[in-house]
From Swiss-Prot:
Gene field: ligA
Ligase among keywords: yes
Entry GO MF terms: DNA binding; DNA ligase (NAD+) activity; metal ion binding
Phylogenetic placement of the source organism: Bacteria, Pseudomonadati, Pseudomonadota, Gammaproteobacteria, Enterobacterales
GO cellular component terms listed in the entry, alphabetical order: cytosol
UniProt-annotated binding residues for NAD(+): D32, A33, E34, Y35, D36, S81, L82, E113, R136, E173, K290, K314
Protein name, UniProt field: DNA ligase
Keywords of this entry: DNA damage, DNA repair, DNA replication, Ligase, Magnesium, Manganese, Metal-binding, NAD, Zinc
Catalyzed reactions per annotation: NAD(+) + (deoxyribonucleotide)n-3'-hydroxyl + 5'-phospho-(deoxyribonucleotide)m = (deoxyribonucleotide)n+m + AMP + beta-nicotinamide D-nucleotide
Length: 671
């Protein structure tokens, strides 16, 4: 056997293995970028020796074989995949190939849309009624998932409107919004169920359940992007026109679909979507670019496994492979001990990543991770990089187990793990310098007491030099003492003292949040402040009374009660008040007497506002009798969506909650 034959055989075997893991087992072992690299390598070798191309080569088909647990459906029109480009140069080369094949010098009109990271499905409607649904499978045969697809509320069981074809096969992507993904994993961790690595795996696993009742509990959704069978009817002669027609018939279509009349316009679309990617509320891995004219699509035709008139322009990979060199343990402000993987540095989504969170001991056990392992790292948006899975097939011989500490790595105190919790905590409290540092950093942060100019490095020095032990000590600092810190001159020191003086005037909600009570975020702090009105009333509240606050359950109520029951905490609060920390007296609001469209409503703000600050909006809403919550739930009455609204908007849409924009909010505020 020639060396190139051996190389081709090994590449095909490797790709088939990973196709099986991805398409059939829903348990990919390598990131998409590595699969794409292997596929490109195989194509290049086959281009050198076309006589060695075999019919079963991964380059000659679309996906892996369907599961045998489901009935199979043969696609009357094959479900092809798309070729990929990864940079501007490759896209421009693709654009030129299209123009050359069309023998045209005029710009092509492109229809650009999001490349959703979910599961491709085909849905067949006969006389407007959903009769079957299938996965892509290998492109010619897929799994029958009709019962499961019928449970997805975004997909209509019957189309509405006029001129619906006798047989219409709609193609699109089933996916799981990030809010739904987080909820599924949260429930799984609590019940000991399967935790999914990413939303795509969760969507695929949900859709391939043999019991549709399980699928029905998962908040899957769907966007359509194309057509297969079309009989007994007509569709518009442009891709965008077809999408708009689908929408008119009740099918969900992404609102990020744009016509571009030049290659530069396509590149602008690509970069705008890439910028907005972290706020979409669901995962995408690129944009799809299609010739808009159906006549030109037909003229361009297909290659073996993909159309010539479309391409997927993929973003820089959010997943990459690297090695775990060590694991260290960090201590947070509540004593939580978090394992952090120290990695062989690797570029992920344009950022050099050398650390990744491992969350807790349960996560290490779930991953089966050992020091020295080859792992897949994922970084999405502003999310801290995390280890997705271990590449077990490439585990080195010299790996060693990860041993969780029995004593705090900073102060040496015993660690404990409360039954029912995943987190291990240091019992040292303020004896532990790590907890003191993190508590003080939280206290002065922008959304807490907002002490301008007091950064992490200043806090570290203040604790290490024993200048500060509690938050109250901050307000006793002098410019002279601060001047002794590294890189702190007299002017900078005085600015910090001035900022501390300014921060004394705060709000009750900010003060509560700054105290760092476990499980009390901004929204909960605001809810507690609004409900009790005064610090005295809150300190005197029982656990039962605390649970009367919206969105406060037994766990949060217990943490709040225990915090105020601790004498040292009450002492620190007393010192803070003695140093001059204060806030306005509460304004008693009788909601029943307020004539406002917001009175008595639970409202959630999401996205960025252009006409006023988030705090101003909250204050005005509360003044009109609203309760402003931090998360969307079934109890939410209204969501106000600003620019770049993300997962909260997606969850509101899933739950059918009324959504208004900033302009409508301002109109109602003045009503």
């Amino acid at each position: 056997m020639e060396p190139i034959e051996q190389q081709l055989t090994e590449l095909r075997t490797t790709l088939r293995h990973h196709e099986y893991l991805y398409h059939v087992m829903d348990a990919p072992e390598i990131p998409d970028a590595e699969y794409d690299r292997l596929m490109r390598e195989l194509r290049e070798l086959e281009a050198q020796r076309p006589d060695l191309i075999t019919p079963d080569s991964p380059t000659q088909r679309v996906g892996a074989a369907p599961l045998t647990a489901f009935n199979q459906i043969r696609h009357e029109v094959p479900m092809l995949s798309l070729d990929n480009v990864f940079d501007e140069e490759s896209f421009l080369a693709f654009n030129k190939r299209v123009q050359d094949r069309l023998k045209s010098t005029e710009n092509v009109i492109w229809c650009c849309e999001l490349k959703l990271d979910g599961l491709a499905v085909s849905i067949l409607y006969e006389n407007g009624v959903l009769v079957s649904a299938a996965t892509r499978g290998d492109g010619t045969t897929g799994e029958d998932i009709t019962s499961n697809v019928r449970t997805i509320r975004a997909i209509p069981l019957k189309l509405h409107g006029d001129n619906i074809p006798a047989r219409l096969e709609v193609r699109g992507e089933v996916f799981l919004p990030q809010a739904g993904f987080e909820k599924i994993n949260e429930d799984a961790r609590r019940t000991g169920g399967k935790v999914f690595a990413n939303p795509r795996n969760a969507a695929a696993g949900s859709l391939r359940q043999l019991d549709p009742r399980i699928t029905a509990k998962r908040p899957l959704t769907f966007f359509c992007y194309g057509v297969g069978i079309l009989e007994g009817g007509e569709l518009p002669d442009t891709h965008l026109g077809r999408l708009l027609q689908f929408k008119a018939w009740g099918l969900p279509v992404s609102d990020r679909v744009t016509l571009c009349d030049s290659p530069q316009a396509v590149l602008d679309f690509y970069h705008n979507v890439e910028k907005d990617r972290p706020t979409l509320g669901f995962d995408i891995d690129g944009v799809v670019i299609k010739v808009n004219s159906l006549a030109l699509q037909e003229q361009l035709g297909f290659v073996a496994r993909a159309p010539r008139w479309a391409v997927a322009f993929k973003f820089p990979a959010q997943e990459q492979m690297t090695f775990v060199r060590d694991v260290e343990f960090q201590v947070g402000r509540t004593g939580a001990i978090t394992p952090v993987a120290r990695l062989e540095p690797v570029q992920v989504a344009g950022v050099l990543v050398s650390n990744a969170t491992l969350h807790n001991a349960d996560e290490i056990e779930r991953l089966g991770l050992r020091i020295g392992d080859k792992v897949v790292i994922r970084r999405a948006g502003d999310v801290i990089p995390q280890v997705v899975n271990v590449v077990l097939s490439e585990r080195p011989e010299e790996t060693r187990p990860i041993v969780f500490p029995t004593h705090c790595p900073v102060c040496g105190s015993d660690v404990e793990r409360v039954e029912g919790e995943a987190v291990t905590r240091c019992t040292g409290g303020l004896i532990c310098s790590a907890q003191r540092k993190e508590s003080l950093k939280h206290f002065v942060s922008r959304r807490a007491m907002d002490v301008d100019g007091m950064g992490d490095k200043i806090i570290d020095q203040l604790v290490e030099r024993e200048y500060v032990h509690t938050p109250a000590d901050l307000f006793r600092l002098t410019a002279g003492k601060l001047t002794g810190l590294d890189r702190m001159g007299p002017k900078s020191a005085q600015n910090v003292v001035n900022a501390l003086e300014k921060a004394k005037a705060t709000t009750f909600a900010r003060f509560l949040y700054a105290l760092g009570i476990r499980e009390v975020g901004e929204a909960t702090a605001a809810g507690l402040a609004a409900y009790f009105g005064t610090l005295e009333a809150l300190q005197a509240a029982t656990i039962d009374e605390l649970q009367k606050v919206p969105d406060v359950g037994i766990v949060v109520a217990t943490h709040v009660f225990n915090f105020f029951a601790e004498e040292s905490n009450r002492d620190v609060i007393g010192q803070l008040l003695a140093e001059g920390v204060h806030w306005p007296a509460p304004v008693v609001i009788n909601v029943q007497e307020i004539d406002s469209p917001f009175a008595g409503k639970t409202v959630v703000l999401t996205g960025s506002l252009s006409q006023m600050s988030r705090d101003d909006a909250k204050a005005r809403l509360v003044a009109l009798g609203a309760k402003v919550a931090g998360s969307v739930s079934k109890k939410t009455d209204l969501v106000i969506a600003g620019e770049a609204a993300g997962s909260k908007l997606a969850k509101a849409q899933e739950l059918g909650i009324t959504v208004i924009d900033e302009a409508e909010m301002i109109r109602l505020l003045g009503a």
